[in-house]
Amino acid sequence: MKFLKFKNKRESLNEGREIKSGFLDEDGKVVELKGDILDYFNADINAVLENIVESYSLEDIEIESPVNPSKIVCIGLNYRDHAKEMNEELPEKPTIFIKPSTAVNKDDNVIIYPKISSRVDYEGELATVIGKETKQVSPEEAENCIFGYTIINDVTARDFTLGDGQWTRGKSCDGFAPIGPYIETELDPLNQRIVTKVNGETRQNSSTSQMIFSPQEIISYVSETMTLNPGDLIATGTPPGVGEMKADSIVEVTIEDIGTLKNYLIKEE
């Protein structure tokens, strides 16, 4: 099932457009649900259908970020083909870093290219959405902590990361974590085609089957030291082909069973 958050564009701006939760049905309609997406963690289909409010066409809604994570835990080198591209040895354990909640962005929205940066890169990734409080779980137990999967673009100010000697500042600019458009609860995370395009040109084209560490293994490793909250994201690493985006570019990340995350890079004035 594809869950999403959205606003009704037909609601008056003066009254304020409330962020609603819902899912995409088989006919491409957006079905509003009572409560929040995360309320439906482990819910069966009957529980979902009992909480329907009304339906909308996609043309009548504005898609929002599907979650508001307290943190985004990101994984460094996690694709075998990316390691080969960089002439790197396969890591023995995941390399982790964190993007702040202020980096969260949404589908079909602007990414601001910081005026103090000289290079901004795309990194298309599969993201795991945590469904419940998670601490010190095994990989087998981690499967029961996953709400679903979405797309994230781990946008990076590359000149910052190279110049600083560490990643925090270059990964943490406001809006540098577009997420969405949907959370898919039923997919094989290790059998997904992942493609990133810039201005229609394919830059990344790989498969999540190339992952070194599975989402479940990553959750287990991360949860050894930090509590993962419902709605937190784990970005599972990017495939080969990472590169620069120029100002005024359109970047699209597609994962076959989720959809396409599309954003526009605009230079800060």
Identify the role of each PLM range:
Residues 1-94, 187, 202, 254:
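N-terminal non-catalytic cap/leader segment that marks the start of a structured domain
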Residues 56, 62, 66, 82, ...:
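Catalytic-pocket segment enriched in acidic/His residues
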Residues 90-107, 122, 252-257:
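Structural signature of FAD isoalloxazine-binding scaffolds in flavoprotein oxidoreductases
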Residues 107-127:
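A structural-propensity feature for long, helix-poor, extended segments
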Residues 125-129, 150, 195:
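Residues embedded in well-ordered beta-strands
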Residues 135-149:
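N-terminal accessory regions of nucleic-acid-interacting proteins
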